A protein has these predicted regions:
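Short, flexible, surface-exposed loop segments at domain boundaries
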Residues: 2-61, 65-110
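Noncatalytic, solvent-exposed loop/strand surfaces
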Residues: 106-507
Length: 507
C-alpha cells in the first residue's frame, strides 16, 4: 500500500486573477456531428433549445483531450460529447471530448430511473454524489463480496487537515478540501498513487464544536474546479495546477448570514452557470457565470430563507428545467433560465438542519430530513409547480443521503437502514446494519459507511438485507465519519478528517 502525508504549506499557489483572454474566446457545448481530420475541421450539434450546428477549424497546435487523455483530431468520433474553446474566427484552441456511456442500474420499473451521465466515464466522480448527484456509480465488475479483513488497500494519504469534505475525481486527479493552520485549503492528489499535486487557499477556517473545517465537496468541470468553504468563500481554480481564476464570498455579496454549523453546500455546474444557495436578502439561490463569477441571476424566494446544508439538483423532465434544493425551512424549485421561484413546500423540512440532497426521477422529487421530520414525494406539473403526493416518517434521514434504484429508495432512517417503495412511501425491509451512516451504490451493491467506523457491503434489492462483507475502518479520527463513501475507477474512497483511505474493489 502506498501512503504519504500531504504538506499543504509548500503547495499553496499564489492567487492569479485571469482577466485577459476571457472575452477573446468562447466555449461551445454539444455533440460531434462530423469530423474531417484531413481538413482539420470538426462540426458539432450545439446543446440547448436553440440547437443548430457549428463548424470549427482545429489547428495542429490545438489541445485535444478524449476522456482526459491527450489525443488527436483523427481519434475523435461522431457522437462524443464536445466542449470546444474557440476564438471569434472559430479557430479552436482546446477540444475536450468524452465518450457517452449510459449509467445503468438493474433496468427500470415504473418510478425507477437509469441515470443519464452523458459525457462522464465510469472512472470519474466529478462532484458531490457523483455524475448525476444521486450517489449511484457507473462502475461495473466490482467485488460482490469482501474477505474478512475487507478489500485490499491501494493507498493512503494523510495531512489533509480537518473537515467533512468527500472527494471529486476527474482526469486522474482526486480533489478534496481540508485545513492547514487557520486556512481552508483545496487539495489535489494523483488518483493512481495518491501523490500530492497541489494545494490552494480557499478562505479562513470556521471553528465550532462539531468539527472545524470545510463541509462541501469540490466540483470539477472541464479544466476548472469549484469549491465553497464553510464561511461562504467560493473559489474557482485551474484543475491542473491549482491557480486561482476568481473567488468571492457569497454571504457578503448576497446579504446572507452563516448558518449554525457552517455552509455545507457543494456547488452545481450547469452549462455556463454555477448554482449555489447563499440564502441572502439579495438572493436565496443564485446563478453565476462559471468563467468569471459574475451574477447571471439571483432568485428572490419569498421570506428570504437562509441556506440549508443540502446541495441542489437539476430536474429537467418537466415543462421547464429547474433546480431543486432545501433551504432552512422548506424545499424549493427555481426555474433554471432566470431564477424565478416555482414552488416551495415544507412537508419534509425542519427548522434545524435539512442536509440530504433531494432525489428525482421523471417529474417526481423525493426529499427527507432528520430531527424527527421524515420524507415526502412531490410531483412536478407542466408549469413546474410542485404538488405533495405523500409525506410520512418512514425515512428520517439526517445527512447520510439516499439512493434511488429501480423505484426503491435506500437510506438510513436514523439508526436503521431501510428500503422504501418510492411510489407508496411504504417500507419494504429494514435492518440495523452498520447503524447510522451514509450510502453509495455501484454494480448492484450498496456501500454502507457507519458514522462510527464500520463499512459494509450489501445487495441493492427490495427483497431483503443481504450483507456480503464488512470491515472496521483503520485510522479512525475522533469525529463522526460523515464524508460520503465514493466508488470510482475500481476503488473505494473513504475520507475521515486528516486521512483519505483508498481500497481496490475491482474483481
Amino acid at each position: 500500500m502506498l501512503s504519504g502525508e500531504f504538506r499543504f504549506r509548500s503547495l499553496i499557489v499564489a492567487t492569479v486573477v485571469l482577466v485577459g483572454g476571457v472575452a477573446l474566446a468562447a466555449t461551445y457545448y454539444g455533440t460531434v456531428e462530423e469530423v474531417a481530420s484531413d481538413a482539420n475541421e470538426i462540426t458539432i450539434k450545439l446543446n440547448g433549445k436553440a440547437g443548430g450546428v457549428k463548424k470549427f477549424t482545429v489547428p495542429m497546435e490545438a489541445q485535444v483531450l478524449i476522456d482526459g487523455k491527450k489525443s488527436g483530431l483523427a481519434d475523435v468520433e461522431v457522437g462524443q460529447s464536445a466542449t470546444i474553446v474557440a476564438d471569434g474566427s472559430n479557430n479552436a484552441s482546446r477540444l475536450t471530448l468524452k465518450n457517452v456511456k449510459a449509467a445503468g442500474t438493474k433496468g427500470t420499473k415504473a418510478g425507477g430511473r437509469s441515470p443519464d451521465a452523458a459525457g462522464v466515464s465510469a472512472g470519474e466522480w466529478p462532484q458531490h454524489r457523483g455524475p448525476n448527484r444521486d450517489n449511484v456509480s457507473m462502475e461495473k465488475g466490482l467485488l460482490d463480496k469482501w474477505p474478512a479483513a475487507g478489500p485490499k488497500p491501494a493507498w493512503k494519504q494523510t495531512g489533509l487537515g480537518m473537515g467533512y469534505s468527500s472527494v471529486a475525481i476527474s482526469d486522474g486527479r482526486v480533489i478534496t478540501m481540508g485545513t492547514t493552520g487557520s486556512d481552508e485549503v483545496l487539495a489535489a492528489m494523483n488518483a493512481v498513487t495518491g501523490k500530492q499535486l497541489w494545494g490552494a487557499r480557499v478562505g479562513r477556517v470556521r471553528k465550532d464544536g462539531t468539527g472545524d473545517g470545510p463541509r462541501g465537496t469540490p466540483t470539477i468541470d472541464e479544466d476548472r474546479v469549484y469549491t465553497l468553504g464553510a464561511n461562504g468563500d467560493l473559489l474557482c481554480a485551474k484543475a491542473d495546477k491549482g491557480n486561482v481564476v476568481w473567488q468571492k464570498n457569497i454571504l457578503e455579496e448576497f446579504g446572507g448570514g452563516n448558518i449554525t454549523w457552517g455552509i455545507s453546500e457543494s456547488v452545481l455546474i450547469d452549462g455556463d452557470n454555477l448554482i449555489c444557495t447563499p440564502g441572502g436578502k439579495r438572493g436565496t439561490m443564485v446563478a453565476l457565470n462559471k468563467l468569471t463569477g459574475k451574477t447571471v441571476w439571483a432568485s428572490p424566494v419569498e421570506g428570504a430563507p437562509q441556506a440549508a446544508y443540502s446541495s441542489p439538483i437539476i430536474v429537467k423532465d418537466v415543462g421547464e428545467k429547474q433546480y431543486v434544493t432545501y433551504v432552512h425551512t422548506s424545499v424549493i424549485g427555481v426555474r433554471a433560465s432566470d431564477g424565478k421561484p416555482l414552488w416551495k413546500q415544507n412537508a419534509s423540512a425542519n427548522g434545524t438542519a435539512n442536509c440530504s440532497t433531494p432525489l428525482h426521477t421523471g417529474n417526481k422529487v423525493f426529499t427527507a430530513s432528520g430531527y424527527g421530520t421524515g420524507c415526502a414525494l412531490f410531483e412536478l406539473g407542466s408549469d413546474g409547480e410542485g404538488t405533495l403526493v405523500y409525506s410520512n416518517k418512514e425515512m428520517v434521514n439526517h445527512h447520510g443521503g439516499m439512493v434511488l434504484l429501480d423505484g426503491y429508495v435506500y437510506g438510513f432512517d436514523e439508526q436503521i437502514l431501510k428500503c422504501i417503495d418510492l411510489a407508496t412511501g411504504k417500507t419494504k425491509w429494514q435492518n440495523r446494519s452498520v447503524g447510522k451512516g451514509s450510502v453509495t451504490s455501484a454494480d448492484g451493491q450498496l456501500y454502507l459507511r457507519s458514522e462510527n467506523g464500520p463499512i459494509a457491503l450489501c445487495a441493492a434489492t427490495p427483497d431483503g438485507y443481504e450483507e456480503t462483507g464488512r470491515f472496521e475502518q483503520p485510522n479512525r479520527s475522533d469525529k463522526p465519519a460523515w464524508s460520503h463513501p465514493v466508488v470510482c475507477g475500481g476503488k473505494l474512497y473513504l475520507r475521515d478528517q486528516d486521512t483519505l483511505l483508498v481500497y481496490d474493489i475491482k474483481k
